[in-house]
Curated annotation (Swiss-Prot):
This protein binds to 23S rRNA in the presence of protein L20. HAMAP family: Ribosomal_bL21 (MF_01363). Belongs to the bacterial ribosomal protein bL21 family. This is Large ribosomal subunit protein bL21. It comes from Phytoplasma australiense. GO terms for molecular function: rRNA binding; structural constituent of ribosome. One of its GO terms (biological process) is translation.
Length: 102
């Protein structure tokens, strides 16, 4: 059984026992989180939402809040002595999907 959820402006396919990375959520590690924006549930029978499936939710446990590996943003204009170097680390939350309720 798997479901398609919406979080952080993205759609993710999740199943029970799966670990996922999502945009940072404002909760602490070891707490539980519930996704109510379930777009579809696939199992013995398929349920599609318009736009969401009524009564469906996905429960997850927060493993950790962290920041991704640093990337370098380098802007450059030739012959103009313009160089701008900037780093960025995206914040994310790692979750363990515990239950899909449809």
């Amino acid at each position: 059984m798997f479901a398609i959820i919406r979080t952080g402006g993205k759609q993710l396919r999740v199943s029970e026992g799966q670990e996922i990375f999502v945009e940072k959520l404002p909760i602490n590690p070891e707490q539980n989180y519930e996704f109510k924006e379930v777009l579809a549930v696939y199992g013995e029978k398929s349920i599609l939402g318009q736009p969401y499936v009524e009564g469906a939710k996905v429960q997850a446990q927060v493993i950790k809040n962290d920041r991704a590996k640093k990337i370098i943003v380098f802007k450059y204009k030739r012959r103009k002595k313009y160089r701008c170097k900037q780093g960025h680390r995206q914040a994310y939350t790692k979750l363990l999907i515990t239950k899909i309720i449809a």
